[in-house]
Amino acid sequence: MDKKDLFDQITEVTRNTEDLLNKLHETQSAMVEIMEENAELQIENQHLRERLKQATAAENEGTKNTKYGLSKSLQNLEKLYASGYHVCNEFYGKHRQDEEECAFCLTVIYGDR
Amino acid sequence: MEDLKNLTNQAVEKQPEIVKRFNEMIDSQHLSHAYLLTGAGGIGKKDVAQWVAMRLFCIDLQGSMPCGECEECTRIISGQHPDVVEIAPDGQSIKVEQVRFLKAEFSKSGVEGARKVFIIEQANKMTTSAANSLLKFIEEPSGEVTAFLLAENRSLMLPTIVSRTEIIELKPLPKDRLIKELTEQNIAETDARILTRLTNDTSEIQTLVDNNWILDAHKALEKWFITATTGDITAFVDVQTRVMALAKDRFYQEKILDLMMLYAMDLLELKFDQETITYEANRRQLQELADQTNVRQLLAVADVLLPLKHQLSQNLNFQSVVEKATIKICNIFKMRGR
Amino acid sequence: MKFTIARNTFIKKLNAVQRAISSKTTIPILTGLKIEAEEDRLILTGSNTDISIETTISTNDEEAHLNIESTGAVVLTARFFGDIVKKLPDNTMLLEVKDGFQTTITSGASEFKINGLDANNFPHLPEVDSQTTITLKADVFSEMINETVIAVSNQESRPILTGIHFTIEGNKLSAVATDSHRLSQRVINLPEPIKMPEDIIIPGKSLLELSRMLDDEIDTITLQISENQALFTFDETLFYSRLLEGLYPDTSRLIPKESSTEMEFEAPELLASIERASLLSHAGRNNVVKLTINAANKQAIISGDSPEVGNVEEEVVTKDIVGEDLEISFNPDYLKDALRSFGHTSIKMAFTSALRPFTLVPTEDQENFIQLITPVRTF
């Protein structure tokens, strides 16, 4: 292989690698997006189940406060937060990067009332 | 300075109605936050976007026209205005860092004033997630922001983007104007006429003009067509010796089939005494041929050529498709050569 | 344009302006330095659009030996123009721009000719004529930046949190930053009340750059706000920063109003303990340390446990502990940053529960400076 071919080839390989990297980036963000959507759906699903329960068990006397004095809906939020998603107004439904704690979310769940 | 001035005029000349519409929107302060400008390449999408930017920033408006000469206008035209942010795909796509830059720019105030304009070329080359991440900014921008997304076709864009922008379809350029523009670029008028029959897209035209491809193709096909229509079977050899060298890839192959078709159409035009034909340079020869053949034969030629493009799209081999067609045409004109 | 100037003075000013100039930019002219000669002064400007720095050398400045023969303006590529100026042989230099922006730089026996650019294409910095001009002590403001910038987010996905939120109302200037994991808030009192309240978000990066320029020689700094830029003025320098647009989240509700456990200590003491404990937490997979408070015994224990590496436990020297017993875990790096921002002072730390953010304030001044940290959930 002469030098020019070699050079062309390396350029080609570099370009291919760049393309691949870009595709990886895309796939990564697509995945995060799906996870976030999934989280939102989970929240929604939870809410719907909750409504269903309330509807079927009408005798149920309102929302009982349970663990840490949290209401059912706050418990849901807590569960969702624990599974790695924001529940605060600012970033609702977004994936919590590296599972880092979020002061906004914690205030929503445990804050003063 | 001279060519800068040209650029200003291009939006006005290429898309006078659109320019007028934007003028009205600006005057009545009804400019939206986001526009999707669609239309083929070379149709003046970026010209229109830059024109609007100039209209908004120009410090020496001539009536309702930007002057094209002040510091604001010249900086916009040369892409140096910090508050007119332009992004075009870097290679195959709009890259992750480019989108990051865009988002950062969307979230910051202007450098020189409150107003900002964004121009995103080939916006369809953004990845889905990149486009989605820009939605928030397009939907509820902070400050006086106008974003232009440019794309050839609205169907290339995500529905979420389409639904959040005002769509403006640019009209194809008038043929005469395109021909005039091409002759100004030292392309012979006869060639310009052929080119505009093939495409409206100036970037495609440029590709066809490069390395004299259109000139060579015109010559080769002229020889091939004349030979074939005298019923001379050596036209079959022309396919291998003359045409194949020009058919480098699918793009050129399709254009060759279009060029062939244009001969058949010219013959029909002449048979029915129409004035304008594509191959003006061959008018005499074609007129003679049209006179000597009957309509049935001419329609038969069209019938042979029409399905070729479809066959090509079904991955049939270009050379064998054209060779087969050549034999059929020779057969139609068999009697004439003798 | 033609002028002569003492090279030392010119280099000093050039260095200041060069902070704003980046070689990576989408607008080519921004790799350049703008030099503008007026009748009685020379103005140097650099900009990366995010920040712009403009500095003036007056003909009255004796050290500068500035002599302007003719006025004008040019933009020169900053990197190699800077290198050239620094390597010139003589104490003075002459700069002359001819037609077509060709620039000649002469010093001693050396002469450079370089191509310049049209200064008209350089960004035009806004004229700031705001009615509100706030004058601050440079060292206090610099401190304010450094205390709050630690909590600024570096994630572009939340652009608004990459800035420090300034609000000015009455005679109070307050600065808040949060990356949602922690928060810093500092308030300073202004000598006189401001007529119009202001509310702006300035990128943390801009402010860090600004604070680096505020050395001991600078006494006061003024702040003016235009519709799109914040302008800081000190000495002969103008420092512009673009603003972040949008609404900053309401941070006041993040700060708990009550507490169930309080602990008092000297900042350096706890800092030293945390630094030791974080040696192990850094080596482990999750960067967490635990604080165990036994209120009855007035005892506070910092511990770190990394299964792969080992564990550490140490009792913290405290001044006082009141309230309920508590076990709380957190990222030691956040606490280190917060403690460092306090310097040598006595701190009060207040907790509400193991799940809610806790706060640190100086015992002496509990109103004007607060650091807040979110605990890590360990179940």
UniProtKB/Swiss-Prot annotation, chain A:
InterPro entries named among the record's database cross-references: YabA
Main location: cytoplasm
GO annotation, cellular component aspect: nucleoid
Superkingdom classification of source: Bacteria
Entry cofactors: Zn(2+)
GO biological process: DNA replication
Cofactor detail note: Binds 1 zinc ion per subunit.
Localization of this protein: Cytoplasm, Nucleoid
Keyword terms: Cytoplasm, DNA replication, DNA replication inhibitor, Metal-binding, Zinc
Keyword Protease in annotation: no
Assembly notes: Homotetramer. Interacts with both DnaA and DnaN, acting as a bridge between these two proteins.
Function: Involved in control of chromosome replication initiation. Inhibits the cooperative binding of DnaA to the oriC region, thus negatively regulating initiation of chromosome replication. Inhibits the ability of DnaA-ATP to form a helix on DNA; does not disassemble preformed DnaA-DNA helices. Decreases the residence time of DnaA on the chromosome at its binding sites (oriC, replication forks and promoter-binding sites). Tethers DnaA to the replication machinery via the DNA polymerase beta sliding clamp subunit (dnaN).
Protein family: Belongs to the YabA family.
Protein name, UniProt field: Replication initiation control protein YabA
Annotated organism of origin: Pediococcus pentosaceus (strain ATCC 25745 / CCUG 21536 / LMG 10740 / 183-1w)
Highest classification ranks of the organism: Bacteria, Bacillati, Bacillota, Bacilli, Lactobacillales
Name of encoding gene: yabA
